[in-house]
Amino acid sequence: MTNAITGAAIVGGVCGQPIKHSMSPVIHNAWIAAAGLDAAYVPFAPAADRFETFVDGLRGGAVRGLNVTIPFKERALAVADTASDLARMAGAANLLVFNEDGSVHADNTDGPGLLGAIAIQAPGFDVTAAPVVILGAGGAARGAVAALLLAGAPRIAVVNRTVARAQDLADTFGEKVVAKGEDALPALLPEAGLIINATSLGLGGGAGPSADLTLTPKTAVVMDMVYKPLRTEFLRRAEAAGRRTVDGLEMLLRQAIPTFETIYGQAPSPKIDVRVLALKLLGEV
């Protein structure tokens, strides 16, 4: 189902590098079609050194809103004129809203999307009960840390190959967040209640992070922000160890809802199950 659009169409989009794998256009355009809106949602892949120029070119209303993904989330916050409390706390943005006066507002729906996905796929999980381990220290990790702290996580270890990058993130958030190298994982995992892959490792079917998930408590939840493939190598290892898992597609769907509401001015239509649609396109059903 598709809609013809006019010159008055509301245009949204997603920006990243690479962007070909993104399911966001499928999700948003399905909601647009179901609602019969005069609107579109378009993928963009600006050169890595042209992101700020690209955003400046959209000021003034050509695009109503823009999702931002790897590797631009931290730069998205920096290019904005104003920002939500959550985006400022995270130090990163995954949504830019373009106002008629030419100003740009930054927001971050990654954290709420993460918590929403956990609530759906790991019901009853208590984020306040045990430490969290996050693999990666980029913009996605920043959004996760901000939301988890607000939700009451007692301690968060950010593990990154480059410890200095993890330390820069930890310094933003205070004493509850610590930076660690990958060699610290054997000591961290036995106490972790939640383990999150916030890197791009595993995208396209490659190997995920090398963490030994058999070291985690049997009650631990393992989450991967990567959603292509749906059952990443990281999640398959978690399942083999008997751990509950949360996939990246559910996080994408949960963060897409407030994005759609912001850009198009209404809630997504319940007429279509976009998860089923996305699963079909991923070859999962």
From Swiss-Prot:
The active site is at 73 (proton acceptor). It catalyses: shikimate + NADP(+) = 3-dehydroshikimate + NADPH + H(+). Gene3D superfamilies: Leucine Dehydrogenase, chain A, domain 1, NAD(P)-binding Rossmann-like Domain. Shikimate binds at residues 22-24, 69, 94, 110, 227. One of its GO terms (cellular component) is cytosol. NADP(+) binds at residues 85, 136-140, 160-165, 225, 248. One of its GO terms (biological process) is shikimate metabolic process. Its EC number is 1.1.1.25. One of its GO terms (molecular function) is shikimate 3-dehydrogenase (NADP+) activity. It comes from the Bacteria. SUPFAM superfamilies: Aminoacid dehydrogenase-like, N-terminal domain (SSF53223), NAD(P)-binding Rossmann-fold domains (SSF51735). Keywords: Amino-acid biosynthesis, Aromatic amino acid biosynthesis, NADP, Oxidoreductase. Pathway: Metabolic intermediate biosynthesis; chorismate biosynthesis; chorismate from D-erythrose 4-phosphate and phosphoenolpyruvate: step 4/7. Involved in the biosynthesis of the chorismate, which leads to the biosynthesis of aromatic amino acids. Catalyzes the reversible NADPH linked reduction of 3-dehydroshikimate (DHSA) to yield shikimate (SA). Homodimer. Belongs to the shikimate dehydrogenase family. This is Shikimate dehydrogenase (NADP(+)). The gene is aroE.
